[in-house]
Amino acid sequence: MAGMVDMKNRKKDVLRKVFGYDSFRTGQEEIVDNILLGRDVCGIMPTGAGKSICYQLPALLLPGITIVVSPLISLMIDQVKALNEAGVHAAYINSALTENQITKALYNAMCGRYKIVYVAPERLETNRFLEFVLNADISMITIDEAHCISQWGQDFRPSYLKIVNLIKMLPKRPVVSAFTATATQAVKDDIVCVLGLNNPFIKVTGFDRSNLYFEVRQPNNKDAEVLNYVLSHRDDSGIIYCATRKNVDKVYAMLAKNGIAVTRYHAGLDNDMRKANQEDFIYDEKPVIVATNAFGMGIDKSNVRYVLHYNMPQCIENYYQEAGRAGRDGEPAECILLFSPQDVIINEFLIENKGENNEFTEEERKAVHDNDIRRLKKMRYYCSTKECLREYMLNYFGEYSGKDDCGNCSNCSAVFEEKDVTNTASVVIKTIKECHERFGTLVITGTIRGENKAKLRSYGVDRYSTFGMCRQMSESFIKGVIDKMLLDGYLRETDDMYRILKLTETSDMLISGEEHLIMKWSERKEEFKKEKRTPKSLDADGLMLFERLRMLRIDIARNENVPPYIVFSDKALTDMCIKRPHTKAEMLNVNGVGENKYERYGKEFLKCIKEHENQEDIHG
């Protein structure tokens, strides 16, 4: 009993002194406690929920070394910088280091100088690393971005399977912990199974980010839509994601031409330019960045007020993770997806023309392809549903709030008219029957609209009994009905690029009138009431102090060559503005300020606060 009390005190002490927090966030303490008890853990926690503390804190209390497997070099470097700034000795092993640097880092770890070692999965089976782990005292192996180990995941990497062999090779099995931000039930089960987690403690903290507003728009001109949005949010920092480098360059040039302080990021730029552009964004020199999805992993910029998607992403997992880079400070932020049917075609092309991965077997390649197509289908449904957008995504991840109206998405803030479209749905079903389930949405839509196209005539659909039965209806309306039928399970699509429409067991219930298909149709949109987004609880003077502290943070970050959030987070700056600390003890009561952070930076921030208050007195 005394040992448990002592561990609890030590745990709280590390949380306070190293990480600067008085209390754990949702799910963190349970995960930490189970790891310290020697139990395997699987944590599913959304972006910004504090996953890293869940393994970094127990790593400092366990007797040996913790190995953290991470897929991205930039992510490792930032994590190690943040730990070093907090007074924790950590290292990383990846291709950014020379062989001599790797040898030195592993030697130092073996000598007990590092408690945490980050490693790229490709390094796990190198002779040097194997020699190290077989002779070192390994207390825990942590797998970050654990969805990469699952064939059901959106980013399956065969190199992650090397982790399984590594665990088996160790003379003593360590605690194994796995973390990811986005995982469906199938992916979660696969993570547990493939890693061979022993009776794991599984914690899903919930995917909902209530401060994020979600919206899907289908503009006639995406460029004009983006420009108007950015111009009306000039004071805000934002990310604009595009599916291709070509679109990144086009949108970037358009915004720059119109006087926006904007930068860009994609794999076609050289390393130096990517690094410089990323720093311009992080330091708010250029608060807007246009990027492919190569950008953002591990970027902890808390004041991003909006994420626009110029193109629809390939899957809900990617969309939720990318959109989740907005509002990490807990303040209101907007996530807006600009959809066009062309986005589906672009993504199908990208899926069909993925570069060959020699690590994949033929069976794995087919499984990944089929899963990609299935996920793309779910993403497309998101863009057409009239139901709550937040609830749609939560349901996708296996979470159900039971709410019909979240009050913070475009569908829930819209006024809809309900229409019974059972008759149209019945015509669709009869047409699919008549063609013996051989065609997809475009052909079925063209058939019942009676379109006079040579391609349709070549299929012989002009002889169908249903040809032209919905001639008066628009193409978009019929496609909307078909999407609704797919969503409600009255139809299904094949999992390939042709997306052939197939009937289900419930299809005939619409023809018989046993069930009805009710579709929401947008009548008019209410203007979304945008809140003035300023740090919580700050008055005009508090905002002036916040800006002074923010500028001080940027200067320090540049001098130290670290991202600003590593110095202090926006939340910490806001807390300083509220509490106005004057002494070390008072500064240590600020959320996010630990002993090591205080010793490095605290005095400069205390001085800045004092100068601000003295100016207040003079002008008072």
Predicted regions and their residues:
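Accessory DNA-binding and partner-docking regions appended to nucleic-acid-acting proteins
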Residues: A2-K11, I345-I346, N357-E362, N371-I373, ...
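Flexible coil/turn residues that form the inter-helical turn or adjacent wing/linker of helix-turn-helix
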Residues: K172, R234, K386, E437, ...
